[in-house]
Amino acid sequence: MSANVQEAANAAIEPASFVKVPMPEPPSSLQQLINDWQLIKHREGGYFKETDRSPYTMEVEKPVNGGSGNTEMVTRNQSTLIYYLLTPDSPIGKFHKNINRIIHILQRGKGQYVLVYPDGQVKSFKVGFDYKNGEVSQWVVPGGVFKASFLLPNEEFDNGFLISEVVVPGFDFEDHTFLKGEDELKHLVGPEKAAELAFLA
């Protein structure tokens, strides 16, 4: 088990059939979970629900848009917590990044993460409880690193993948950026690697 993604075993990127062609709806057991927990569709893919937002706030330094190197002080909640679920009908979390670090904790199922660092380094690792084969169940993604995820087949959770995410300082969409399609991906990792990762862009 590793909270440091750099220590996690590198995994080949081999999406399952339902990742390439999503199913029309989730299995009944996962649909029941979505209904019971009142999860909603996430704009990056998958389903989510915010379960806690700290009532306490803090002043943090945030880069000003435009890459000028300037910063501004903004107010953020001290932390936020969500459930995040991938299912066979919504099996991909598209590339995005946050200014702040995000802590991830596996709850059920299996998935795979792909990280793209500002220097173009790519790291991919599997998430699960099979530690002997290099899977991880908790990990931290640094701020400024693009991350994407996709579902891996598993019987124990009906091909679902459920995690918790903690953001410190708390999540705010002003701190969140989506990858700008394949062109930005090519700029970061080159055309050959971008072609391999295009399904996550």
UniProtKB/Swiss-Prot annotation:
One of its GO terms (biological process) is pyrimidine-containing compound metabolic process. It comes from the Eukaryota. It holds the Pfam family Cupin_5. GO terms for cellular component: cytoplasm; nucleus. CDD domains: cupin_YML079wp (cd06121). This is Uncharacterized protein YML079W. The lineage of its organism: Eukaryota, Fungi, Dikarya, Ascomycota, Saccharomycotina.
